[in-house]
Amino acid sequence: MYKRQVYGVKYAPVDYYVALIGVWEQINKRYDNEIPQDIKKICDAYAAGINKYASENPKIVRSEIFPLKGKDVIAGWMYQIPYLYGIEKTLSKLFKKEKPVFSSDIILDDEYNFDPLKIDLIGSNVIGVGPKKSADGFTRLLVNTHQPWSGPTAWYEAHMKSENGLNITGGLFPGSPLVNHGHNDSLGWSFTSNSPDLIDVYELEMNPLNENEYLFDGSWKKLEVEETKIKIKVLGPIKWTINKKIYRSVHGPVLKQEHGTYAIRYSGINDMRTLEQFYRMAKSKNIEEFKNAMSMQALPMYNTGYADKSGNIYYVYNALLPVRDNDYDWRGILPGNTSNTLWTDYIPFKDLPQVTNPDAGYFQNCNANPFLATGFRKDISSFGINETAGIEGHQTNRSLRAIRLYGGDSSITREEFYNYKFDNQYEKNSVMAYAIDRFIEDFKSQDLELLAAVDLLKNWNLRTDLDNRAAALAILTFPLTFDIADYKHDVDHITDR
């Protein structure tokens, strides 16, 4: 059963997306042979529990979608994971009437043409402090992901315990039978969003004599073509069926538009193992087992912070980074006529930016560059990663403040650990402070009232307490002086200015 059959025409694009990326094609081919038995049992048990709830509460569920099966759980993850790192934005741009601009230049990429007052900033934080930096010798982990209050990416809290050793509490997404982040009786972990380049768009050179052939390495190749039936609920029991062709090339799903024919390739394409990785993480009892679970690389993104009862702390810029040819602009639209742009391998997990038990005694990530997780580049190891990975070059104010507070205190008490988390100050080299300083420098006026306001900004202590009039004025002034290029600064520029 598909969403548009139950909820109507507005969900037809969702079902088209499911068909486009081949969710059910892959599951029907591979589920029985490739999903481990312990994961199948979890999926089946979860589906049975949902079905039981539905049977006992028929007035508050849509009976058309039941009964659920274990396969539906895996399908949910295959559907959701690419969404979590932005595939819907890529598809939306390709569906526009005019050819879209994909660019490594933040100024040119039309995704960033926004009003600064309407910026929807991602705001998760993870901070680990080890025994050597704690006043009482304890190890602490700040789990502070910021999710919506409702919807498909809202956290639901649960404590799960089983006879085979699972004992974990934490947050999970709707549709997940397992905790996605939290802690068991030995260790804990948390995520923050990162934004590596995990999606590539290729423009295909089509055969003028055959609309379903494209040029690849000097010869014409046929697109794979299948027809999917999209049934849409119109009124009551009345349904309308749309026949839609789905195309695929060697790269992945293909979209035929008036402004061109495009293929999409994304990290973790056709991977069904995400739930298995979460299970292995939840069952881990020490840092080695946790790293082994993470090395499955079935979760293509998220900064991950870890701490355990033995006093270990660990940070990794988790990302399924394709091994790409450095001669191409991977943020733009790529030529689809050559195997030089068709990646098939990924950077190994051990080579990702990461640090175990850093000399600094702590780590932090607040949606920022991974190489300053401790404030010192020398602490973070990585290998074989180049600019094609698209790793963030910026530092958020939260990250700068975490480095200042947690990094600057050699003996952090329990109270200080909590107080630092609720810090409400801008750092001197934050984008906000930089923009306001520029405004003050450039401002010219003889108006005494305006000059008084500027003087208020000059003396702002960068705090945002409720009674701080300068903070209110700075926030209102920010759109006047903000430049999107401020977010383009690399780490050296941000940390040095």
Where are the regions a protein language model picked out?
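Hydrophobic alpha-helical segments
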Residues: 299-409, 463-464, 478-485, 489-495
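Glycine- and hydrophobic-rich flexible loops that cap the catalytic core of alpha/beta enzyme folds
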Residues: 121, 160-174, 178, 182-186, ...
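Gly/Pro-rich active-site capping loops and adjacent beta-alpha segments
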Residues: 3-9, 19-24, 188-239, 341-398, ...
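Second-shell loop/turn segments in exported
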Residues: 25-41, 265, 275-281, 385-392, ...
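Substrate-recognition/specificity elements adjacent to catalytic centers across diverse enzyme folds
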Residues: 3-152, 161-165, 169-178
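A terminal-accessory region detector
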Residues: 92-109, 328, 447-497
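Stable alpha-helical elements in mature extracytoplasmic
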Residues: 23, 39-49, 274, 290-293, ...
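Terminal end segments
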Residues: 377-379, 383-451, 455
